[in-house]
């Protein structure tokens, strides 16, 4: 039996025309009864696989719409003498039977697929024998399992891949991963790639397109199985590089299962090591050697098993080295980052220390400013004390001479001195009167030394005005008002309102009580003045009949400072209400030595002075109660003391 082999470059071809298609035998191979005369399996389906990059020359079979085997005019010279032989008929029948099986299997596999026209012809291919690989398989068993096919696979071989050519070309290396090893070997061997399935393997695969498992020869039409290996369909399932909603991936059968497992085990570290390796080494073989690490497919050639094993071992060693290098690089990078972070912390600490230093300096400056302000305030207070007229017993202060003169002649001042005269010896009360008059004269002399007295007085008033530091948007201004100390009430500076307040019953009752408390407080101030060492010495001299107010200028300055301090303490304590009471109570014990100088000249006066001293604690307690807001509780005792005085 002779047959014609369809090998590129051969001179023998076979041409036969069946005019009577009904005479063609039918056969059942477990898939149903197929007749080549029908259109089943051929209509709308073009199947071709070869190795030419272009389809200009077509070698092999091409199915025409007339259901006849015809060779194209561009084929090699036909041998018409062999068309009438019986052996040719049997050969063609077997060929038709086997070709009927292929489209049926493909149509079952590609459910809902869109196929090309039936008029397309088969492209040329190189002879390849796959019997060595498929010897253990059944006669008509395909190279993949039907159970793993998805019914939703819908794809067109002609036009649906065109839109993804560029995308697939860019992602071809990473998408197919290790399964693309066979394609790379074919590309290095200089063998032309296949252009079957329309343009399926032409542009999308490029140099990565893969041949069938038998890389040396294609299967013969008379072999046990003419169906191509599942390696032919790599890249058609899963991966996400193709449209249509179906899951295209890395082959079928056991290979697809293995690739599913390996795909799940892939991590981003594998791709990172690839990139680092390429950047460092730059050799084109490293991605292929790394790809063999996860290659678990069965479609490797038997002739190249040793070579692939060598490549796999080299790939494993290379990948391990790459991983180690990447780990070392990662550790180095982490160390560098840590060093940078540590380096950043030091300047931060330095910045913090500088901030602390700045804060400390600011605090020191603020403290210095506060101390300076306090010093200025003290100096101002001293200046005010020197130029201001003061009546310590009545707690009256003023910057003007006429006001001070009017105060000394006022009823208020005289009543206070009368009350003090009833509680103290007459000579002591007279000494206090002379002391206040002499102090007023000294203040007048000090005021004459000041050049701009009026400006100084105005400056003092400005300093006392706290509203100057408040901005105008707060709408706060200084106003003049009358303060009623008896009623503890501020009254607007209006004549009618002030007169109305003065005529009220509450004000009259409060002012009488306040007058008694003011007299008692004046007695306490008098005792505090007499307890001063300098003033007590003057009092002794005054009692002896000498003039105590004719001292040297140096002594006068010392006395003024001492007297000013004592009087100011008493006056400020009385004004505050608390400090005065505290000073008045402890000031009482030193008072008893006062009768000693009085007892020397007139013996009778000491006993009355001692009796008067017994009433002093009551005055102090009444003052404390008045300060605490309970005025008038000691009125009866005060009236008794006051009644005895007049």
Swiss-Prot record:
Q: What is its main location?
A: nucleus
Keyword Repeat, does the record have it? yes
- The listed location of motif Nuclear localization signal is 274-279, 362-364
What's the PTM story here? Phosphorylated on serine or threonine residues possibly by PKA; probably modulating the interaction with TMPO isoform Beta.
Instruction: Write down which residues bear the modification named Phosphoserine.
Output: 283, 297, 552
| Bias type Low complexity, positions | 564-586
Keywords carried by this UniProt record: Acetylation, Cytoplasm, Host-virus interaction, Metal-binding, Methylation, mRNA processing, mRNA splicing, Nucleus, Phosphoprotein, Repeat, Transcription, Transcription regulation, Zinc, Zinc-finger
UniProt modified residues of type Phosphothreonine: 267, 292
Q: Name one GO biological process term.
A: mitotic chromosome condensation
User: Which residues are recorded with the post-translational modification N6-acetyllysine?
Assistant: 257
Q: Where in the cell is it found?
A: Nucleus; Nucleus matrix; Nucleus speckle; Nucleus, PML body
Which ranges are annotated Basic and acidic residues under compositional bias?
287-296, 337-349
Q: Where is this region: Sufficient for activation of CTE-mediated expression?
A: 1-268
Tissue specificity remark: Ubiquitously expressed. Expressed in the brain cortex (at protein level).
Query: At the top level of its lineage, which domain of life is listed?
Result: Eukaryota
Q: Which residues carry this modification: Asymmetric dimethylarginine?
A: 208
Q: Among the entry's GO cellular component annotations, what is one?
A: chromatin
Question: Which protein is depicted?
Answer: A-kinase anchor protein 8-like
């Amino acid at each position: 039996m002779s047959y014609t082999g369809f090998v590129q470059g051969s001179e023998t071809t076979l041409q036969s025309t069946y005019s009577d298609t009904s005479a063609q035998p039918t056969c059942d191979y477990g898939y149903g009864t197929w007749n080549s005369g029908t259109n089943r399996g051929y209509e709308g389906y073009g199947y071709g696989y070869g190795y030419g990059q272009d389809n200009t020359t077509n070698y092999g079979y091409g199915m025409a719409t007339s259901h006849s085997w015809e060779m194209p005019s561009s084929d090699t010279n036909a041998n018409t003498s062999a068309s009438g032989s019986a052996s040719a008929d049997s050969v063609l029948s077997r060929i038709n039977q086997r070709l009927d099986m292929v489209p049926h299997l493909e149509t079952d596999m590609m459910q809902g697929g869109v196929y090309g026209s039936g008029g397309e012809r088969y492209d040329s291919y190189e002879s390849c024998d796959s019997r060595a690989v498929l010897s253990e398989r059944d006669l008509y068993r395909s190279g993949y399992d039907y159970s793993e096919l998805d019914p939703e696979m819908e794809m067109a071989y002609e036009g649906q891949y065109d839109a993804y050519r560029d995308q697939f070309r860019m992602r071809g290396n990473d998408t197919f991963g290790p399964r693309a090893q066979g394609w790379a070997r074919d590309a290095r061997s200089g063998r032309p790639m296949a252009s079957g399935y329309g343009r399926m393997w032409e542009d999308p695969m490029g140099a990565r397109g893969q041949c069938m498992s038998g890389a040396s020869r294609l299967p013969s039409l008379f072999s046990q199985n003419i169906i191509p290996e599942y390696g032919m369909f790599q890249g058609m399932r899963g991966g996400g590089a193709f449209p249509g909603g179906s899951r295209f991936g890395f082959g079928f059968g056991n290979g697809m299962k293995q690739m599913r497992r390996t795909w799940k085990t892939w991590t981003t570290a594998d791709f990172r090591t690839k990139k680092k390796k390429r950047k460092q080494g730059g050799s084109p073989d490293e991605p292929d050697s790394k790809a063999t690490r996860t290659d678990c497919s069965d479609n490797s050639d038997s002739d190249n098993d040793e070579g692939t094993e060598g490549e796999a071992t080299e790939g494993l060693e290379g990948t391990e080295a790459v991983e180690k290098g990447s780990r070392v690089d990662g550790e180095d990078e982490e160390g560098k980052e840590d060093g940078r972070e540590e380096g950043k912390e030091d300047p931060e600490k330095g910045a913090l220390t500088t901030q602390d230093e700045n804060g400390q300096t600011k605090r020191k400056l603020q403290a210095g400013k506060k101390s300076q302000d306090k010093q200025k305030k003290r100096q101002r207070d001293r200046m005010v004390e020197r130029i201001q007229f003061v009546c310590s017993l009545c707690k009256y202060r003023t910057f003007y001479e006429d006001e001070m003169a009017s105060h000394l002649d006022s009823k208020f001042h005289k009543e206070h001195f009368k009350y003090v005269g009833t509680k103290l010896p007459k000579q002591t009360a007279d000494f206090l009167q002379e002391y206040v008059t002499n102090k007023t004269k000294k203040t007048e002399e000090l005021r004459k030394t000041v050049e701009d007295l009026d400006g100084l007085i105005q400056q003092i008033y400005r300093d006392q005005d706290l509203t100057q530091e408040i901005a105008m948007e707060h709408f706060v201004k200084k106003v003049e008002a009358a303060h009623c100390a008896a009623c503890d009430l501020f009254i607007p500076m209006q004549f009618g309102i002030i007169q109305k307040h003065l005529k009220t019953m509450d004000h009259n009752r409060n002012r009488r009580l306040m007058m008694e408390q003011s007299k008692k407080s004046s007695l306490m101030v008098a005792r505090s003045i007499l307890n001063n060492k300098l003033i007590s010495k003057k009092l002794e001299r005054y009692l002896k009949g000498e003039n105590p107010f004719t001292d040297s200028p140096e002594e006068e300055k010392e006395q003024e400072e001492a007297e000013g301090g004592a009087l100011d303490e008493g006056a400020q304590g009385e004004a505050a209400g608390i400090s005065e009471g505290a000073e008045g109570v402890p000031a009482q014990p030193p008072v008893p030595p006062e009768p000693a100088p009085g007892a020397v000249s007139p013996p009778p006066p000491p006993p009355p002075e001692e009796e008067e001293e017994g009433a002093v604690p009551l005055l102090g307690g009444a003052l404390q109660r008045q300060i605490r807001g309970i005025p008038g509780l000691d009125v009866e005792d005060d009236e008794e003391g006051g009644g005895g005085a007049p």
